Regions:
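Mobile-element integrase/transposase regions
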Residues: 1-35, 41, 57-62, 66-69, ...
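A short acidic/small-residue loop/turn micro-motif
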Residues: 36-37, 47-54
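Cysteine/selenocysteine-centered motifs that mediate thiol-based redox chemistry or coordinate metal-sulfur cofactors
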Residues: 69-89
Length: 210
């Protein structure tokens, strides 16, 4: 079940959704994002003037090109998880998904938490990016690019055992967590050693004073 069984590897399932921004003097712009469900890594994004099936396809093309899943032999192509918006239920997107040999899973109506990861990402991102006004689309794109870079490579996630999405996406998390465990064990051993020495040091000091 796509909703109750957690993914176990990168590129097993991608979550996608739109959110919106207002550019002063230009009107509304719509951000299409694709997030890897396992690592929370933002694989691709695109700032669009509409929320059409073609915009979804364009973002998917970027994600496929970035990951190379169409150029290597894989057990199965990533499944796409989305809501039931018009652009996601269109026959145009269905034909595209079939041509890419990808399965499309849509969330149950009135249960938006099935896309919880992408929705949380968009909320977090908008809390930062919307702190200022934008007067040109390229200004907004620039800030979005900065945020994605920070989110993927520098923002630690508690749900990922305090590593970054990039660490998980590129398979570095085991090495990082092992190194942390070694440092933790070494620190604890050093503390125990110092604690064992403390009473002896105090006793020697007392004798010297006498």
């Amino acid at each position: 079940n796509a909703f109750t069984n957690p993914t176990k590897q990168v590129n097993e399932m991608w979550q996608t959704d739109f959110t919106y921004f207002k550019v002063v003097g230009w009107g509304w712009y719509y951000l299409s994002s694709i997030l890897d469900d396992f690592s929370r890594f933002i694989i691709a994004w695109e700032l669009c003037t509409t929320m059409a099936a073609g915009d979804v396809q364009s973002t998917l093309n970027k994600a496929i090109a970035f990951t190379g899943v169409d150029r290597v032999k894989v057990k199965h192509r990533p499944r796409l998880l989305s809501d039931n918006g018009p652009c996601y239920v269109s026959s145009q997107l269905a034909e595209y998904m079939e041509s890419r040999e990808m399965k499309h899973v849509r969330g149950a109506p009135y249960h938006p938490m099935t896309q919880g990861k992408i929705e949380r990402y968009h909320r977090t991102m908008k809390n930062i990016v919307k702190l200022q006004h934008y007067y040109f689309p390229w200004e907004l794109e620039q800030e979005l690019s900065k945020f994605v870079e920070h989110y993927n490579h520098h923002r630690y996630h508690e749900s990922l055992k305090n590593v970054t999405p990039a660490d998980v996406f590129y398979g570095r998390q085991r090495k990082i967590l092992s190194a942390r465990d070694r440092i933790k064990r070494k620190t604890m051993e050093e503390r125990r050693r110092l604690n064992l020495r403390s009473p002896l040091i105090s006793k020697v000091d007392t004798i010297v004073q006498i």
